[in-house]
Design a protein with these regions (language model features):
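HhH-family (HhH-GPD) DNA N-glycosylase catalytic core used in base-excision repair
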Residues: 2-486
Length: 486
């Protein structure tokens, strides 16, 4: 229970829900106001600011006239700003920025909770389900999130539902009633009230504000997405890796380098999906960010939020390349590599259990498992014909050997790789599975659990690369220098 800190002295104040002393408070406010004044997009998603005279909250890079310092308030999350009565700016759309990289880096209960909320756990299982996954009471989780972020799990999930609803309203022609329930709202009335409170507009007005050409006519056409990223993004090495690892029937990478299309099947809580992601950059914002274009086909629209979050983890879109490049670029051995590939990512996975089995079995064996035990899609799409077999199916079908042992451990919960799993506990549980060695456990920790600071066992990796050793290894591999470095 050491993750939970006791309340500090009364002399402390709050900034973004984080307790701090008066001097640190003023310094933090000054630095954040400077980021707002200079419209520094590097801080988009790291914090939000609200203007008391207008009732609007924005991202730091908002192009609107900079408000007076005395009228500005700062928040750690969009949910905290919404909870204080502020509405999203229609000009900079602060709800659409990449999430804070902290939630992927942090291994404490707040980071784990934010990853689970992003995966839709609160919508599916409620606060009690979230707390149970974290191993704490609902009251403890509420208190910790509110203390650090200025918003509890319900408010954080509400902000996420609002964003999902806006995406569906502005990119599809689905009836508003369907969108309400697909976004996770319990009723149309709750949906209407929330949209009006968050965006100062009715759902119909929000839809009318988007160009009609941006909306797809039917669910079969898929949902067009702009998967935003912070700072520079090196799509080439990510797609190279996806192409090398692609398992036939489940994944496909097609097209020439620089214009490749990655497609894969998805097993989701309510149904299945197929996603296509374009390698070509979709655009930039002042040279400091942009997006990847994607199209998502779902059998159940309630899976939209979860599917998007899993794609973001696969492509490592919420990373902070500025922090990573600054630390690694200070090392003489890595500086030329960082200069050559600024914003290089450490890819994750769209399905942690699937990745763990594949990492242990290898590509050829994984393809055999798919063809023999994978579930055939009701509507195959070209070469995408199957879902990767679930752990329970593999454990029953092939109980012998290392992949079967791992599948059994995943199926019975002995090994947990969900977004809220404790990384240290998961690695120890993996090492207890017969046939799983330290190298496999390390790659699963880096890719399936999204740990940014993993070094292969026995590798001569300096501590000065912490907390970004996973990214350092990505640079060495992309440059073809990993074998020499080892």
């Amino acid at each position: 229970m050491s993750d939970f800190r006791q309340p500090g002295p009364r002399a402390w104040r709050r900034l973004d829900g984080v307790k701090t002393d008066d001097v640190a408070l003023e310094k933090a406010r000054d630095s954040r106001y400077e980021a707002v004044r200079s419209r520094d997009a590097r801080f988009d998603g790291a914090f939000f600011f609200a203007v008391e005279t207008t009732g609007i909250y924005c991202r730091p890079s908002c192009p609107a006239v900079t408000p007076k310092r005395s009228n500005v308030r700062f928040f750690a999350t969009a949910a905290a700003a919404q909870g204080s009565g502020f509405r999203a700016c229609r000009r900079c759309r602060p709800d659409a920025v990449p999430g804070s990289a902290d939630w992927n880096v942090r291994a404490d209960v707040v980071g784990r909770a934010m990853r689970l909320i992003g995966d839709g756990v609160v919508d599916r299982e409620g606060v009690a389900g979230l707390a149970g996954r974290l191993g704490y009471s609902a009251r403890q989780v509420q208190r910790q999130l509110t203390a650090e972020l200025g918003a509890g799990p319900v408010a954080l999930a509400r902000a996420q539902r609002s964003h999902t609803a806006r995406v569906l309203l502005q990119t599809t022609a689905l009836p508003v009633t369907e969108i309400a329930f697909a976004s996770g709202f319990a009723s149309v009335r709750q949906f209407n009230e929330t949209i009006r409170a968050v965006y100062a507009a009715t759902p119909s007005e929000l839809r009318a504000a988007a160009p009609a050409r941006s909306r797809t006519g039917a669910p079969s056409a898929g949902i067009p997405l702009r998967l935003a990223h912070r700072g520079p993004y090196q799509a080439g090495p990510v797609f190279d890796l996806l192409q090398r690892e692609a398992v036939a029937g489940v994944e496909e990478v097609s097209g020439p380098t620089g214009r490749r299309l990655y497609r894969r099947t998805l097993r989701l809580p309510y149904g299945t999906g197929i996603v296509a992601v374009d390698e070509r950059p979709g655009g930039t914002r002042n040279g400091s960010g942009g997006w990847l274009d994607a199209r998502l086909h779902l059998t159940d629209l309630r899976d939209l939020t979860t599917a998007v979050q899993r794609l973001r983890r696969l492509l490592d879109l919420d990373a902070d390349p500025y922090a990573v490049d600054e630390r690694l670029g200070a090392d003489p051995r890595l500086a030329p590599l960082v200069d050559a590939r600024p914003g290089l990512r450490s890819p994750g996975t769209a399905d942690p259990d699937e990745f763990a089995v594949r990492a242990l079995a290898g590509r050829a064996e994984a393809e055999r498992l798919v063809q023999r035990y994978g579930k055939t899609l009701d509507a195959p799409c070209g070469t995408l014909t199957h879902l990767f077999p679930e752990p329970g199916v593999l454990a029953e079908a092939e109980p012998y050997g290392a992949p079967g042992a791992l599948a059994a451990a995943l199926a019975d919960g002995a090994v947990r790789l969900d977004p809220g799993a404790d990384r240290g506990d998961a690695e120890r549980a993996l090492l207890a599975v017969p046939g799983v060695d330290a190298a496999t456990a390390a790659v699963v920790r880096a890719r399936a659990l999204g740990d940014p600071d993993v070094a292969p066992p026995g590798a001569a990796v300096p501590d000065t690369w912490r907390p970004w050793r996973s990214y350092a290894l990505s640079h060495l591999r992309a440059a073809g220098e990993w074998e020499n470095h080892r």
